[in-house]
A protein has these predicted regions:
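Charge-rich, low-complexity N-terminal segments
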Residues: 1-126
Length: 126
């Protein structure tokens, strides 16, 4: 088994806010991330797949195709967007990094070919 990691970048805004809580509790728990006017980050997304290299190509999956898949289904939908408002697969969810990673996983996993398994995601927020 070998692993291939592709790194993609995007910029996006979001806020962490629980509507069932008071503004004071939201600020206590989420701090500046609960800002009513949102806040932005630069993100690095590491997508790692695993599999056995094809004997003819030496690839698990062509890295360019993996990049195109991630761009089409993830980064093009997230880049320069408000994650809470503009991204279908994040609507109605608390927009934490952890929930964003789960949503990205759910978007990517079924789109990969059977011979390339999604192994892990790493999302870096700066």
């Amino acid at each position: 088994m070998v692993y291939l990691t592709r790194i993609e970048h995007f910029n996006a805004a979001h806020k962490l806010y629980n509507p069932d809580w008071t503004p004071e509790k939201n600020e206590e728990v989420f701090g500046r991330c609960a800002n009513a006017n949102w806040h932005g980050h630069n993100f690095e997304l590491y997508v790692t797949i695993k599999g056995k290299p094809d004997p003819d190509t030496g690839f698990i999956f062509d890295a360019k195709k993996l990049g195109a898949l991630v761009q089409e289904h993830i980064t093009d939908k997230l880049d320069h967007r408000n994650l809470n408002v503009d991204v279908d697969f994040m609507r109605g969810k608390m927009c934490s990094i952890e929930n964003l990673e789960v949503a990205i996983w759910n978007e990517l996993e079924p789109r990969l070919p059977a011979f390339a398994k999604l192994h892990c995601l790493k999302l870096v927020e700066t």
